[in-house]
Amino acid sequence: MAHDLLFRLFPLLALGVPLQSNRLGPTSRLRYSRFLDPSNVIFLRWDFDLEAEIISFELQVRTAGWVGFGVTNRYTNVGSDLVVGGVLPNGNVYFSDQHLVEEDTLKEDGSQDAELLGLTEDAVYTTMHFSRPFRSCDPHDLDITSNTVRVLAAYGLDDTLKLYRERTFVKSIFLLQVVHPDDLDVPEDTIIHDLEITNFLIPEDDTTYACTFLPLPIVSEKHHIYKFEPKLVYHNETTVHHILVYACGNASVLPTGISDCYGADPAFSLCSQVIVGSAVGGTSYQFPDDVGVSIGTPLDPQWILEIHYSNFNNLPGVYDSSGIRVYYTSQLCKYDTDVLQLGFFTFPIHFIPPGAESFMSYGLCRTEKFEEMNGAPMPDIQVYGYLLHTHLAGRALQAVQYRNGTQLRKICKDDSYDFNLQETRDLPSRVEIKPGDELLVECHYQTLDRDSMTFGGPSTINEMCLIFLFYYPQNNISSCMGYPDIIYVAHELGEEASE
């Protein structure tokens, strides 16, 4: 058969893998999982050993044909690193480390670096379980890194190995996660509360920022929010760009109803302290066991919900009731958590030239005035998590910590940032920031597909350069942003700066 020329074949009995299996094949102990396609046909489980630099995958596909899984890049599937396998009608299995030489054609690697751990087929599923090193010496193997990784999954209806667009899927995943939810405590008295907009008619405009005041859960004593997640209306996932919850002082007089966040009513724009949030591709996030968001005390602020809608198809008659779901408990954590927004001030002169292979924006935060701004002595802050944010031209971000003119560390980074995967991530270890430290945010953009200037702004086709640091203990500092020298920028552009 032609398959014998394409695959390395193994006798079924030599592998000790029965053809008939239960739904999931061999018992899986892999901690992480998600579907890779909109129809939930392809299900991936994975886990890894950081010390050994080995990662294991289990791909389960609703097919009796071949299955494949691997790593690809941002721009083309050609060159993708793909491990393929299946079970032939005679009971033999095939398994091979390959790469794409054309959009639909695979070629076997000279070095076989994937190890088969199990391959089964039943009346419904084909399940392939294998491991591979993070890195190999094979030029056709793409690395598994601590950045966002674009994975490719494909399958056939039979054992004829050829890729078809309708059965090939690419998804961005942060594979090397630091914490798994099973590692964290779940309080027995958990209460769920939804912070949501209600039956909001999304305007037919490209960009809308809708804000509304949110009454907090009514509790008689202090509680802690320990987890949050986006609550999206089905079919509106691609229209909701981000959801943020901001804090407003208890003395704030907040409007009722839903209004433009940055429009005529200044009350909304005065609420700038980010509490929790989610953006494109974001999922649930649980705080470390010793920190939580405080609610139920006289000092706790009022909240505003902000939803950014990107309706670039100008669809009429679309209603939305999206928001943020929070989980809270009376079991108090040791620390109240907070969020520090860093980056480049978006308005009015953040700009990126067209046709740029690489363009950098920098936002510098100097913390020596933090105690003065806080209005009280401020202890060192401990950073445990972060959220990266640019729009479509963003390619990479990082936050770097300096002390006394010396670089201490890169707090967080992603050299393969994807706008479609913006999620809160944990740091491998907590980072201490002292007053006087300098925090530099670096954003890398690419605009090869644009023929006009890209300006900073609220629309998805505008740009931003932001990193949100999750930290404790709580203080009164909400943001620390870099702001360019307007006179210098105007001079470089050959323009005259106005007041």
From Swiss-Prot:
GO terms for biological process: dopamine catabolic process; norepinephrine biosynthetic process; octopamine biosynthetic process. Residues 40-156 form the DOMON domain. Pfam families: Cu2_monoox_C, Cu2_monooxygen, DOMON. PROSITE patterns: DOMON. Its cofactor is Cu(2+). The keyword Repeat does not apply. Keywords: Copper, Disulfide bond, Glycoprotein, Metal-binding, Monooxygenase, Oxidoreductase, Signal. InterPro entries: Cu2_ascorb_mOase-like_C (IPR014784), Cu2_ascorb_mOase_N (IPR000323), Cu2_ascorb_mOase_N_sf (IPR036939), Cu2_monoox_C (IPR024548), DBH-like (IPR000945), DOH_DOMON (IPR045266), DOMON_domain (IPR005018), PHM/PNGase_F_dom_sf (IPR008977). One of its GO terms (cellular component) is secretory granule membrane. Its EC number is 1.14.17.-. Residues 1-16 form the signal peptide. CDD domains: DOMON_DOH. Cu cation B binds at H389, H391, M464. Cu cation A binds at H241, H242, H308. Disulfide bonds join C211-C261, C248-C271, C365-C480, C443-C465. GO terms for molecular function: copper ion binding; dopamine beta-monooxygenase activity. Binds 2 copper ions per subunit. The active site is at Y209, H389. It is an enzyme of class 1 (oxidoreductase). Belongs to the copper type II ascorbate-dependent monooxygenase family. This is Putative DBH-like monooxygenase protein 2. It comes from Homo sapiens.
